[in-house]
Design a protein with these regions (language model features):
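Active-site neighborhoods and metal-handling regions in enzymes and metal-associated proteins
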Residues: 1-235
């Protein structure tokens, strides 16, 4: 696809949207960080429950002055985080993973941005902590591999092998169960892909890296950054 290679102007537009995305995500994190824990383990702030819906409202309100909109923002908590596409609903809980996947679109330029963070109010289980550390290491490893000439498949498969070596599943309904990443532009999912069928990457490709681990009954962890393939790496 001709759209796979972005111009300098397109890249600048997408960096701008990602900057607003980062601001909105920070506002969401601050809402949760400033919350208290009620007697049932739920999060409250200013005597009101901190819900998935409330967090989405904060994100939307932060993006609105920049002519950006969010749709289907994922704010999931607890065992819901084991389902990558679960939007999340209701009161967030302490000591549980909270996955925030925010992908706004600028309504003036029509370009998207994309990022995901996993946080917790209060220490989560040791299992979730270990999953987080593995996902973070996988993301950093993938970023270091990205460069012109490598294939999306090579990077995806390297991350899968890394998770396997750590003792996590990579072939079934648990563990690492989705592609490592995807292109972003005028669509939130476009070419090129970091997947088992991903082709050769070239300068100007804008892609996400979003490794994740998911275990029903336990929860999930996903981290996602967006960047551009440069002449000698990934920025």
């Amino acid at each position: 696809s001709l759209r796979c290679v972005k111009t300098a102007e397109e890249i600048a537009r997408m960096r701008e949207v990602q900057m607003y995305n980062e601001e909105a995500t920070r506002a969401a994190v601050e809402l949760i960080r400033g919350s208290e824990i009620d007697e049932h383990g739920g999060l409250i702030r200013e005597d009101e429950p901190v819900t998935s819906e409330r967090v989405r409202d904060v994100i939307a309100a932060t993006l609105r002055p920049y002519a950006c909109e969010e749709r289907d923002t994922i704010i999931s908590c607890g065992t819901d985080t084991a389902m990558p596409h679960c939007l999340g609903t209701g009161q967030l809980r302490a000591h549980q993973p909270i996955v925030m996947d925010v992908f706004p679109r600028n309504l003036k330029t029509w370009y998207f941005a994309d990022m995901t963070r996993t946080i917790s109010k209060g220490a989560p289980s040791e299992e979730i902590i270990q999953m987080y550390e593995a996902v973070h290491e996988a993301k950093e490893m993938a970023a270091a591999m990205l460069r012109p000439g490598i294939t999306g498949a090579e990077v995806h498969n390297a991350v899968a092998a890394f998770f396997t070596a750590k003792g996590y599943e990579t072939t079934g309904a648990s563990g690492f169960i989705h592609s490592l990443g995807h292109g972003v532009g005028l669509e939130i999912h476009e070419g090129p892909s970091l997947s088992p069928s991903g082709g050769i990457l070239e300068p100007g490709n804008v892609v996400t890296i979003e490794p994740g681990l998911y275990y029903p009954g336990t929860g999930g962890v996903r981290l996602e950054d967006m960047g551009v393939i440069t002449n000698d790496g990934f920025d």
